[in-house]
Regions:
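N-terminal leader/targeting and accessory segments in enzymes
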Residues: 1-83, 87, 272, 276-278, ...
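A short, gly/pro- and small-residue-rich
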Residues: 42-54, 72-79, 188-194, 211-214, ...
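Short, active-site-adjacent cap segments at secondary-structure transitions
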Residues: 64-65, 133-135, 176-178, 231-235, ...
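Short, well-ordered alpha-helix to beta-strand connector turns
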Residues: 16, 28-29, 54, 68-69, ...
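Phosphate-binding loop of NTP-binding sites
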Residues: 81-224, 228, 234-242, 288, ...
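Short internal beta-strands
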Residues: 55-61, 225-229, 355-356, 379-387
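Acidic, Mg2+-coordinating active-site environments of NTP-dependent enzymes
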Residues: 59, 63-68, 163-166, 178, ...
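ATP-dependent carboxylate-amine ligase
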Residues: 1-13, 26-31, 37, 41, ...
Length: 468
């Protein structure tokens, strides 16, 4: 058996066009990676890969007797996976620049804004997205997971390289970092959009979640952009002063708004950004910072910012009933809900109704906190189902309302009934009153008892608005 170093050296000497761990996806001159410990199974799929054009098989069981020089055997393949991926992904580095965006909230919006900014320069960029409505747009790829596994990522990267794209924009989730899905990738630029409590069902505690997010960044990174409106962003900056900072609160940042100017290291821009909420501005500044890092300049006309579009289901406005408004937003964390409600309170003079729930089989620690925020920041609340999945909706709601001491809320489990009731209440309120329907945003389904039921908040509200 060759050593790991010898295997990697041999791998570098072979002209490989791609790699996969699924024999169905093998193309000519691919490397096929077999993690199977079952010799018969490993041989079956490896032979299938060779028949389809694989040039080399990297396997956890020794197949040299059957595959001869087309087999690289490593009995410790699972533990050495990152080393092989680093070698295989290195071929992509020369052809495309990868931009990774992480954060508790704001990843999708930041990536979407950056994709549009790059289009101003007619730069060929792929946006990897798990928002179906966005995946229908030009130069996008749909992924069901925020951050897909290494092999699917390579598939998307190879496709982008074949299409001669120069940039690959992707969101990096804490699950993706922790599970090694981005192992081997060499990021040209990275961004932290925000950081607050979430996913403690998976990470178990806030410290673990924080450490995973922080591990995405290195003190040797040259192209980091972080929001310093959170403690993690400040810490990343303190440990790597080459990091560029953005803020909507602190003018010490490299990118911020001052009066009607966008201040950047590459010069000032007149502020034509069309969205006024602080969290949208913060996401945009992260995207603008990434653009500046890519080109070392901001070279488009500021007025072009007027053309920027927002993601569907992100603070999406529906005008109703004589100057009364409904917003649909994806806010499903305490920090996101607080940010949206602060924005609405600052903009509108009337009452605010907040309609929301919390996902089942997910971080339960945030439920009570979201209930308290909704009650503190709005005048009336309607608690309903989000995606209960297989968890008891009554248990979820009980955890949401446990610290809601004022009795200015209703519990309506059926989301359609809840939205209908919210619209009826809104109609009776004074002008400039708002109904916020939070939690699901763009989603086209609701998960109840393990089944996906077709449902979209925006569609349902538009169906009701003329009959309520």
């Amino acid at each position: 058996m060759l050593s790991l170093t010898e295997n990697l050296s041999k791998l570098e000497s072979i002209k490989i066009t791609g790699f996969t761990d699924n024999s169905n996806f093998v193309e000519r001159d691919y490397a096929f990676i077999s993690f199977s410990k079952n010799p018969k199974e490993a041989l079956k799929y490896s032979k299938d890969a060779i028949d389809k054009g694989a040039i080399i098989v990297i396997s956890q069981v020794n197949l040299h007797e059957y595959l001869k020089d087309k087999n690289l055997f490593d009995s410790n393949l699972v533990n050495h996976k990152d080393k092989y991926l680093e070698t295989l992904f290195a071929r992509s580095k020369k052809s495309i620049k990868i931009v990774g965006i992480t954060g508790t909230n704001g990843k999708s919006s930041t990536a979407f804004f950056l994709h549009q900014l790059l289009s101003f320069k007619d730069s060929k960029a792929t946006l990897l997205t798990n928002t179906p409505e966005v995946s229908n747009l030009k130069n996008t790829q749909f992924t069901p997971l925020t951050t897909p596994d290494n092999f699917l990522l390579h598939h998307f990267l190879k496709k982008s390289i074949d299409l001669k794209r120069k940039y690959f924009l992707m969101e990096v989730s804490s699950h993706g970092i922790d599970q090694g899905r981005i192992s081997g990738l060499d990021f040209f630029a990275k961004s932290l959009t925000s950081f607050s409590k979430d996913h403690l069902d998976y990470h178990k505690n806030f410290s673990s979640y924080r450490n995973v997010k922080k591990s995405f960044f290195s003190t040797s990174d040259e192209n980091n952009i972080v929001s310093i409106d959170n403690d993690l962003g400040k810490e990343i900056y303190s440990e790597n002063k080459s990091t560029l900072t953005v803020s909507v609160n602190d003018k010490v940042a490299n990118l911020y708004l001052e009066n009607n100017l966008i201040k950047t290291p590459w010069g000032d821009l007149t502020n034509f950004f069309p969205f006024k909420s602080k969290f949208m501005i913060s996401n945009f500044l992260c995207a603008l910072g990434l653009y500046g890092k890519i080109f070392n300049e901001i070279d488009f006309e500021a007025e072009m910012l007027k053309n920027l579009k927002n993601l569907p289901g992100r603070l999406q406005k529906i005008s109703l009933f004589q100057d009364k408004i409904c917003y649909v937003d994806y806010a499903h964390t305490p920090d996101a809900l607080k940010s949206v409600l602060d924005y609405l309170r600052g903009r509108y003079k009337g009452k605010i109704i907040t309609l929301f729930g919390c996902g089942g089989e997910r971080d339960s620690s945030k439920r009570g906190e979201m209930g308290k925020i909704a009650q503190e920041k709005s005048d009336f609340q309607i608690i309903t189902n989000d995606n209960p999945r297989n968890e008891d909706p009554k248990k979820i709601v009980a955890q949401i309302v446990k610290d809601m001491h004022l009795k200015n809320f209703d519990i309506i489990f059926d989301r359609k009934e809840a939205i209908s009731e919210g619209l009826k209440k809104l109609k009776k309120l004074e002008q400039e009153s708002v109904l916020l329907v939070a939690g699901k945003g763009h989603e086209n389904f609701q998960i109840l008892k393990g089944k996906e039921i077709e449902f979209n908040d925006l569609t349902f509200i538009n169906e009701l608005k003329d009959v309520i």
